[in-house]
Amino acid sequence: MKFIQLSLIASLIMVAPAVNAAQLISAKEAALPSASGTLATRGISRGPSVKLVSPEADTSVSSPIDFKVHFEARGEGKIDPNSVKVVYMKSPFVDLTPRLKGAISPQGIDFAKADVPPGSHTIRVTVKDADGRETNSVFTLNVTK
C-alpha cells in the first residue's frame, strides 16, 4: 500500500505543470548595440496615458519579472489594443510585440514571468486610442543576476 501511495505521489509530481518563464528579451538581443540618438517622450499629449506598473521604475529586479504596463484613455477615447507596439531599443530595433500579443488588452500589458537577461534594457511602448491619438513612452528595466 505504501508503495502505491509513493508511486502515485511521484507520478503527480512528474506530470505537474512546471512554471516556466517566457522569454521577453534574449541574451543575443541584449548583446546588440544600444540604439543611437535621444530617447525622449513628449511631455504633453492628448493620447492615452502609459504607466509602468511592474517592475517599479528605477528599481533593480531579478529575472523572471512581471512586466505590467497600464493604459488609460483620455476623455471619452478608448484604447485600441491592436495599435500597441513594444520595441526593444537596440540597433537594429527589436519588435517585442509578437511575444506580448496574448498579454495586451485595452487596459495594458500583463506579461507574467518574463525572462530577461541581466543588464539595463530600454523599451518603448506605443499606444493609440480609437481616435488615432498616440503616446510613446520609454522605460528602462534594470535586471540583476
Residues covered by each model-derived region:
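Aromatic sugar-binding surface patches on proteins
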Residues: 101-110
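Surface-exposed, short loops/turns at beta-strand junctions within beta-sandwich domains
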Residues: 113-120
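Solvent-exposed loop/turn segments flanking beta-strands in beta-repeat/beta-sandwich domains
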Residues: 74-86
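N-terminal signal peptide c-region/cleavage motif recognized by signal peptidases
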Residues: 15-18
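Conserved structural position at the C-terminal beta-strand
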Residues: 125-127
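Short, compositionally biased P/S/T/A/G/V-rich stretches that sit at domain boundaries
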Residues: 21-65, 72
